[in-house]
Amino acid sequence: MKPFLRQQLARYTDRLGELEFLLSREDIMQDMKQFLLLSREHTEVGAVASRWARYQQLEADLSGAQELLRGSVDDPDMTAMAQEEIDNASAELQKLENELQRMLLPKDPDDARNAFVEIRAGTGGDESALFAADLLRMYTRYCERRGWKAEIISESPSELGGYKEVVIKIEGDHVYGALKFESGGHRVQRVPVTETQGRIHTSACTVAVLAEPDEAVAIQINPADLRIDTYRASGAGGQHINKTDSAVRITHLPTGIVAECQDGRSQHSNKAQALKVLTARIHEKDRSERAAKDAAERKGLIGSGDRSDRIRTYNFPQGRLTDHRINLTLYKLLTIMEGDLDDVVQALQAFEAAQQLAALELGAGA
């Protein structure tokens, strides 16, 4: 284990002792708010400190087993026993080190949240809209694999069965943490269904993944800053699908951010969903501005998540998916399009963790 990690972990042991002393004080016990705050920290710090103590004990066990091995060259049974202890301790040490590294990394408070995923057709006309539908299918299939719930919040269908734009809400465990790296430009290379000469075309869609904010964040929006318009919901080609003004469009006047919803059964439900999407977009705007500032200071991690960033290419003739941010290439495009995204998601998460660990080491040496 690297020295800087040992230094960080030693601080957890020290802090645990401080917290145990504070929680034993009568004045703290009488202040319920402070007591709960310190108790929560005690639980988090204790989880790290206990693993660090176990790691140190294993190091001592490993050292003892290695000493035993050196002194038992003439005893095959003792040699075998010592080697088994060495193998077991080494394996558990590596597992614990990986756990401790993950626990030391800075946590994104939004990772555990639900998310909105917006998919917009870009360059490529009808083919781009069809690819937007393929991306929607890919994400919904991935949700099924993860046991998440996905529902369409807003959609603008195209003439050929694709989408000019579609927004889905995904509910489940750590949705945003898994999907946040999907934000950006997705390029597809294939022969479109509308192509009669068999030529490969290139088109693109943009994806934005927004964490669903707390209700408290939504409450902070001043109603006076909102303009709410109602209109008739329509299907593909503008065909009206009902005769009441049930669709809702909400504009946040200070930022110009707009959200609309027409898929609910009533104006009330559409307004509620549109407000949630609007809040998520405002939250994401603030977040992306902070991320851009942080990236300028530390050269960025995986990328800004800006729609203009081309993050990935889907090459159907070669069966290839390439994520340009981490130089990941997989030749299993068809299974990925059926929702088998785990290899991609895990590679991006591992890359972020490695970058964060490097930043942590750099900060420790500063």
From Swiss-Prot:
Methylated by PrmC. Methylation increases the termination efficiency of RF1. Coiled coil: none annotated. SMART domains: PCRF. It comes from the Bacteria. The keyword Protein biosynthesis applies. It is found in: Cytoplasm. Keywords: Cytoplasm, Methylation, Protein biosynthesis. Its main location: cytoplasm. Pfam families: PCRF (PF03462), RF-1 (PF00472). The modification N5-methylglutamine is found at Q239. GO terms for molecular function: translation release factor activity, codon specific. Disulfide bonds: none annotated. Gene3D superfamilies: 3.30.160.20, 3.30.70.1660, 6.10.140.1950. The keyword Translocase does not apply. Belongs to the prokaryotic/mitochondrial release factor family. PANTHER family: LD18447P. Peptide chain release factor 1 directs the termination of translation in response to the peptide chain termination codons UAG and UAA. This is Peptide chain release factor 1. It comes from Albidiferax ferrireducens (strain ATCC BAA-621 / DSM 15236 / T118) (Rhodoferax ferrireducens).
